[in-house]
Amino acid sequence: MTQDLPTPRGRLTPDKDLSGLTWLRVGGPADWLFQPADVDDLCAFMAELDPAVPVFPMGVGSNLIVRDGGLRGVVIKLGRPFMDISVEGDRITAGAAVLDARLAKEAADAGVDLTFLRTIPGSLGGALKMNAGCYGSYVADHFVGAQAVLRDGTQVTLTRDDITFAYRQTDIPEGVTITSVTLQGNREDSRVLHTRMEEQLAKRDATQPTKALTAGSTFRNPAGFSSTGQADDTHELKAWKVIDDAGMRGATRGGAQMSEMHSNFLVNKGGATAADLEGLGEEVRKRVFQTQGIDLVWEIMRVGVPEET
């Protein structure tokens, strides 16, 4: 990118390789990576940035495939200045860069039940953007409000009336950067909450490839809701089930594989490219549609351009 960009107080890095910033460890470079010093720095930068330059707010890369040709424009990555957490009664306000797991633990310390976040990979801004959920609870169920910076640098407050929530998605526009989120949870004994989270972690580690290079669930459940984690949760329209029925558990392409442990987890077995991973996912979608007439929808976000050949 040759355009002149504003000079921020934070860090602005050209031609930044993004593969090391994603959990799948794949992807090409961003034209620019911007790490703002604080909210004011972010607002000023966005206000001065040419409106024609694309902007992509990036969390911790836990639910993301960056294509091998990289991302055009500016990738915004929030860091330490956006990691504060404050508690007021049953409400928790946290910076968008706070990890979901950390928020769940600190909320539990305060006797506030946000335990559903404990096993969700990623940070709070991304969790809001995709209405993340687990064990029958979603961000939408706890959402009070958020602070955000629009593409023109305006800082705004978002309420429930400003966001439409659906399964694994919201209508928050592209280019809007969430900076903090307020959630509300039921009051409960801290020890009970921590015990619940330990049980959730044990169940996750026993059923999911947590030690592999993965981006979490690859496809949304066709049923249109997440697993509740309860023993009576036996509905057939789970992504892993239809993938199994299509014979795609363990399927490979290059260094990519649909996990043998949990077939809705796309993993980098070593040396995979973004094209391997996305291509295998598309093979799975095609096979599931051919065998069962079900159109699987990606849960992992895929961004950027393919590598030129």
Swiss-Prot record:
Query: Which parts of the sequence belong to the FAD-binding PCMH-type domain?
Result: 25-188
**Pathway listed:** Cell wall biogenesis; peptidoglycan biosynthesis
Region Disordered: start-end pairs? 202-231
Q: Where in the cell is it found?
A: Cytoplasm
Cofactor(s) annotated in UniProt: FAD
Gene Ontology CC annotation, any one: cytosol
Q: Which reaction does it catalyse?
A: UDP-N-acetyl-alpha-D-muramate + NADP(+) = UDP-N-acetyl-3-O-(1-carboxyvinyl)-alpha-D-glucosamine + NADPH + H(+)
The record's active-site residues are: R168, S217 (proton donor), E299
Q: Could you tell me which PROSITE patterns the record lists for this protein?
A: FAD_PCMH (PS51387)
Q: What is its EC number?
A: 1.3.1.98
One GO-annotated biological process of the protein: regulation of cell shape
Please name the GO terms that the record assigns under molecular function.
Answer: FAD binding; UDP-N-acetylmuramate dehydrogenase activity
Bias (Polar residues): 207-231
Check the record and name the InterPro entries matching this protein: FAD-bd_PCMH (IPR016166), FAD-bd_PCMH-like_sf (IPR036318), FAD-bd_PCMH_sub1 (IPR016167), FAD-bd_PCMH_sub2 (IPR016169), MurB (IPR003170), MurB_C (IPR011601), MurB_C_sf (IPR036635), Oxid_FAD_bind_N (IPR006094)
Q: What are the protein's UniProt keywords?
A: Cell cycle, Cell division, Cell shape, Cell wall biogenesis/degradation, Cytoplasm, FAD, Flavoprotein, NADP, Oxidoreductase, Peptidoglycan synthesis
Q: What is its main location?
A: cytoplasm
* Family membership noted in the UniProt record: Belongs to the MurB family.
Report the protein's function.
Cell wall formation.
- Tell me what this protein is called: UDP-N-acetylenolpyruvoylglucosamine reductase
Organism listed in the record: Jannaschia sp. (strain CCS1)
Q: Which gene encodes it?
A: murB
